[in-house]
Amino acid sequence: LGSRNLEPCGARSIAMATVSVPLSVLRLLEVALTCVSFSLVASVGHSSSSYWAWCMFSWCFCCFLTLLILVLEFARLSARLPISWDDFTTSFAMLAALMLLAASIIYPSVVFSCPGCARQVAASVTSCLAFLAYCVEVGVTRAQPGQVSGFLSTVPGLLKVLEAFVACIIFISLEPARVSAFPGLQWCVAVYALAFIFSLLIIILTVGRLLGACPCPLEQVLVAFNVLAVLMYATAVIVWPVYAFRNNPRPSNCRHCPWDGLVVVSFMTCVNLLAYIVDTVYSVRLVFFVTPS
């Protein structure tokens, strides 16, 4: 009996070690790459651009949170935290990949345009490599049997992370002067904010293992919210371009000017609308067409 009980435990320990060692090496690489990226950009100098601030925040956030994950796992403290650790690490890796993808595109194309500037080019390259490292982490985690366990590790959970991320890109691209002049644009900002708050709330409740305290079934709540979000974003897709570009053509001397931010918001609004439509279809299918086994 003793040998039969110990063997599965030993097998699980070996399996966990097989997974955790490559992940630890991968996370060390992620820390190094993101640290190099923000160090190189910081050494160049400060910029007042909101896109520069977003890129710096992305590199710093990913670097220090990945380092915190490593410390907690090496100290074996992750199991003692009152959170869903697998949900947390999976959703963070997904979010980090999205943030670094945005930073890898925004920084070389918007923040600087100096092909001969070695430090900026090197920062862009290391940012791209860090993005690839986080993508590998997401793939490795989801490929392991039994790793896709929590809500944030499922397709609807990852869509919630994507929706929150796209909303962040929208927020940093807003032009306050234009928004404050038109109630229609203010409605769009309210749509972005309300949908973002709910998605963020779902993520926080999931990581904090507090979804069980919800008096209503989670699946039905998600369906209701997703349908509402689709309707609100559908209005924003129409209203935003109408008021943002009415009597507001692109300036002739516009090179990375605020007008470009209006285009980014329009595009990202369409992206989030598609994400919420997919999320709604998936949620409706789970609630009404998939019978629990």
Question: What does each model-identified segment do?
Answer:
Residues 243, 252-293:
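C-terminal interaction modules of eukaryotic adaptor/scaffold proteins
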Residues 23-37, 41, 53-110, 127, ...:
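Signature of small four-pass
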Residues 2-30, 48-52, 117-124, 143-164, ...:
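Cytosolic juxtamembrane helix and N-cap/initiation of the first transmembrane helix
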Residues 8-19, 41-55, 83-86, 111-122, ...:
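Juxtamembrane membrane-interface segments at transmembrane-helix boundaries in membrane proteins
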